[in-house]
Structure formats: structure tokens, C-alpha cells
């Protein structure tokens, strides 16, 4: 696994249980993506600044300059955006596991018995192409 620096935006959302609420949340997150994208791009272009800060503040003795920068949302309640967003949205219960690389969005496997194949869907579930295999 590649070492990562996470850049996150936190969102406190009301719990929504209807289609209109899901649409509103999704539309809001599409707007939030723009801000998170700017943060991610800034960090990618300024890893040296973060490196110097970490050396000064925490006396780290390793380089983060080759680390991957991953943008994520931290959220208080599940939302439809989690399944199809450009960035992963992690509920409070999953943040630690995700950062420690002990949990990730699962690959959903569906068996197509007619054609004797397995269809695999990965995050974002409705945007990514289906992976077809004969496992």
C-alpha cells in the first residue's frame, strides 16, 4: 500500500430519509467537491510546505514528498453521495479504520447465472464501469 496524506473536509448533515433529501444532499456535495478539489490540488503542489511544518512541529524524520494525497469527506450521518461521489465520504465510525487501511468501500459482486459470470462494482458504484469476470 502506498503511504498517503489525507486532506479532508467535514460536513454535518441532517439525517435524510426520502428521495428529495437524497437529491438535496447529493447536489450540495457536488458543490463541496469543488472546495475539496482546490484543497487537494494545493496540498499536492505544497507537500514541501507540509513536510517542513511536520519537521518543525513534530520532529518527523522521514519524507512525505512521495506520499499520495487523498481527499475525503468526513460526515456525521450516511448520505446517498457516499455511493456515487467523486470523493469517498466516511462516517465518523469508519474514519479510523479507513485511515489505518483496515476498511474500504466494498466491491459489490453480483452473479449473472444466465451468462455464467460475475459482475463487480466498485466505488463510485454508479459511475465506474462494471468489471466482468468468470471467477
What are these regions (language model features)?
Residues 2-135:
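Intrinsically disordered, low-complexity Ser/Thr/Pro/Gly-rich regulatory segments
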Amino acid at each position: 500500500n502506498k503511504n498517503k496524506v489525507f486532506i479532508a473536509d467535514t460536513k454535518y448533515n441532517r439525517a435524510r430519509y426520502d428521495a428529495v433529501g437524497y437529491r438535496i444532499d447529493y447536489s450540495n456535495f457536488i458543490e463541496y467537491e469543488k472546495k475539496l478539489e482546490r484543497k487537494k490540488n494545493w496540498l499536492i503542489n505544497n507537500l514541501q510546505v507540509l513536510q517542513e511544518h511536520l519537521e518543525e512541529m513534530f520532529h518527523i524524520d522521514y519524507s512525505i514528498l512521495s506520499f499520495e494525497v487523498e481527499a475525503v469527506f468526513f460526515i456525521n450521518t450516511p448520505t446517498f453521495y457516499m455511493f456515487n461521489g467523486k470523493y469517498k465520504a466516511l462516517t465518523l465510525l469508519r474514519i479510523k479504520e479507513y485511515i489505518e487501511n483496515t476498511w474500504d468501500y466494498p466491491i459489490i459482486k453480483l452473479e449473472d447465472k444466465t451468462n455464467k459470470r460475475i459482475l463487480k462494482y466498485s466505488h463510485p458504484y454508479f459511475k465506474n464501469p462494471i468489471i466482468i469476470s468468470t471467477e
